[in-house]
Amino acid sequence: MASIARDIFKAYDIRGIVGKTLTDEAAYLIGKAIAAKAAEKGITRIALGRDGRLSGPELMEHIRRGFTDSGINVLNVGMVATPMLYFAAVNECGGSGVMITGSHNPPDYNGFKMMLGGDTLAGEAIQELLSIIEKDGFAAAGKQGSVTEKDISGEYLKHITGHIRLKRPMNIAIDAGNGVGGAFAGKLYKGLGNKVTELFCDVDGTFPNHHPDPSKPKNLQDLIAALKNGDAEIGLAFDGDADRLGVVTKDGNIIYPDRQLMLFAQDVLNRNPGAKVIFDVKSTRLLAPWIKEHGGKAIMEKTGHSFIKSAMKETGAPVAGEMSGHIFFKERWFGFDDGLYAGARLLEILSASDNPSEVLNNLPQSISTPELNIALPEGSNGHQVIDELAAKAEFEGATEIITIDGLRVEFPDGFGLMRASNTTPILVLRFEADTQEAIERIQNQFKAVIESNPNLIWPL
């Protein structure tokens, strides 16, 4: 029986520390396991790409060997943003592809995001890969698979610039946080006719300037400063593999993705009245009424890019988004999460206004916290911790308790959320309310619940 670290098999990707839990041997075995799943589905060709992390080339070589030793033909698209790998998978490989990326994890992490036959591997499908490895259930290869190399970037950029139409050229600033998006974002937005100020767009897997995670306000401070000190109208930021988008106004306001989705939903619903719009459990309580007001049907889903994608497939929703910054367009695009493309769609909408910051700042808003994190003790199961807390929790004045993903407690004047992260050993909390007094009241109720476990430290 092959041995592999079990804890790298997460809810919607595989992710671990390079050389410790995610070894070269693990990459090879994962390649063989994916090939076995592919063989079951009659898939013979898989697109393979990597982000800008230093461990990428070596992991790529080993997973590639796992594929070709199993008779799978590989389309190697090299260093790309995750959405570009998805683009190659959909257009060249029947929806099958593997992206080597650590997303926004620290530099010593890396991992794999996987699609087979148009379906994102998640949950049980990822556990099946582990089972194949542990039972040596690999497919018997006939002949060795081939490797074809292709630069997909030109086709990808052309596909976007071919259908996005700005009403006027804009002046924008972008911050790629030294992630792989920096290699392509400037070219894309200049190709749409904009003036672009580029921050940290050279790809550097050590992330020397700030972490490439636009969901954290501290990582947007350089972009905010560039907007205040320069002549750019709007700022766009990307995570390490550019499948997530951050947005900042001229006056330094961060427009979180749930508010971005208001604008995207309104735009899509103009052309698709009555359509469904999907959002995750972390999103503002102002989003569902906004979607309904603009003629759409609002659907709340559990957090995670693969869960959102499968919900889009099931419901036929043309647009979806989640609080971490993944925005998904099926209308005029392919349905996968794409920070670069979402940025282009945002500019298309904002270019109709002479004051884009005003358009963004006018979106409904209440008082809210960013994501708050509580570190879990080594070896503890976040979902189990949440279940234990929920079992003894009481929330006075709650109007609804939603349990699709952790515990989201609705009150007449706000909500509180606690859920287990699927990618890191933390609990994620978020609060929102109509007034500061209400948000503090809701937080205090959650604080009492959290502190009933002596191993958890309240983050505020």
Curated annotation (Swiss-Prot):
PROSITE patterns: PGM_PMM. It catalyses: alpha-D-glucose 1-phosphate = alpha-D-glucose 6-phosphate. Binds 1 Mg(2+) ion per subunit. Mg(2+) binds at S103, D239, D241, D243. One of its GO terms (biological process) is glucose metabolic process. GO terms for cellular component: cytoplasm. The active site is at S103. It is found in: Cytoplasm. SUPFAM superfamilies: Phosphoglucomutase, C-terminal domain, Phosphoglucomutase, first 3 domains. This is Phosphoglucomutase. It comes from Neisseria meningitidis serogroup B (strain ATCC BAA-335 / MC58). The gene is pgm.
